[in-house]
Amino acid sequence: MPATIVHAGFIYTGTAAPALEDISLEIVPGTMTAVLGAVGSGTSTLCRLLGGLLESRGTPTGRIETDGTVAVLGDDPEAQLSGLTSHVGDETQLACRLHGLAPATAEARARQALSDLSIDGLWSRDLDTLSGGQRQLVALSRIIALAPDLLILDQPSQSLDPLVRRGLAVTLRAYCAQERSVLITGHQVDELTLASDEVFFLDTGTLTTGRETAEESRVSRVSDSDFATACRAHDVWDTRTEEAAPQPTAVPARAVPASTRPTPAPTQPAPAPASSSPILTVQDLNVARHGNRILDGIDLELHPGELVAITGANGAGKTTLLRSLIGLLDRTASCSGTITAGRLGEGPNLAEMPAHARSRSLGWVGQDPGVQLSATTVRRELMHAVPLPRHRRRDRKRVRAQRRTMVEGVLRDTGLSTVSEEHPFDLDVPRRKDLVIASALIADPRVMLLDEPTIGRDLLGMHRLDAVIAGFLRRGGAVLATTHDRRWARESSHRLLHLAEGRLSRP
């Protein structure tokens, strides 16, 4: 038995409420188990507790037994890249070398892990040139190369496109076929969830096992509608589109009945804006790096009140497109083309401006919110983001009052008022991204550039994102967002574009 958890719980030092309470779970060799829950439900704590990573963080209760080796990939895979290497091959085999394996054995295991994840072509690539999803797979390859008996993955698919997620599901099933086990946790239903043998729900520290219907589940799988209802009841976001939803017989057992807790209705996108003058025009945008063409003649217009979503495979260039618009490409990239704030030929060419000047028209929210945060509280972060107009000394008190009023308004609009005195890095990742969105909004840009805004969000987080975007669009702004969440892209955007081979097209 790779892992047995009996009446386990955990209380973090300095807190009164337990993060986990009375958890009992058995992880059987050769199986893949999924535990889903809302943000803050304790999914990450469960991973760390089972992986033995919380001894100094608080007080555990109950009994946890593991048989064999255990490895954990946290919800921030970037933090598990060593920082000691610059190339994929070296990074992947480093963990094996540190565990004392011979160089030839370590390299063989590393190459096999990359091949299993279908990224063996990245062996010689520089880590800095990889997309967020590719870096996530490299972090996973380091652990798979160690071949632990129990592989614990916290939100392993959050930066991956649907095709890669399906491939990863196949890889993990093959991993389990070697009498090893996998535990995955997350806030969203996706291809990995549907490939699991069992699905559990974690709600405010308590694991719902569905034992009331366990006997029935052994005979017939829970229906797809019941599974979807259970997800909504536990504030789990279901990324499946209607055509992608599996038949009821393919849905994992042990989905639980809906609770009585009300679920807020999603914010519906506003009607597509009427024809109007564009507020951003991109013409013949080209980006290359080391002689390789990444973007090839991109043409794009954004209109007031419009949300345009861009999908594409990992490494297709979605982040590169947004960074080229805001002026944040690294020095190894060359960029050409016209980026006009308005109709082509009528507004300033942003391509000729530095990033700080472009930010007057464009708000930037990157994939990793941590790199855009620097203050000690949420409120101070927003105070720093307020543009400071020129003023005389005698007007300083009035200007400060105006800044405070602006900050209070943005805190309210983005739902951050209740955490205004928290440290940004004490917030969960979706809330941190909300804070970066708020910081961009407070500068009053015409266009918001959102890179993977749905990563790691539960159902409530998705509704919160939709509400913030809807408010911005009603004020006449436009949003350009990249995403791997096809359901959100189809339900929330006015236009859906696909980036492949450097070009944009309608899917």
Residue ranges and their predicted role:
Residues 36-38, 311-313:
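The feature captures the beta-strand-to-loop junction immediately N-terminal to the Walker
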Residues 52-57, 63-77, 329, 338-357:
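ABC ATPase NBD Q-loop/coupling interface
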Residues 105-122, 398-419:
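Conserved ABC ATPase "signature" region
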Residues 126-130, 134, 423-427:
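Conserved ABC ATPase signature
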Residues 140, 437-438:
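Hydrophobic anchor residue at the start of the ABC signature
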Residues 144, 440-441:
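ABC ATPase C-loop
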Residues 185-187, 482-484:
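H-loop/switch region of ABC-family ATPase nucleotide-binding domains
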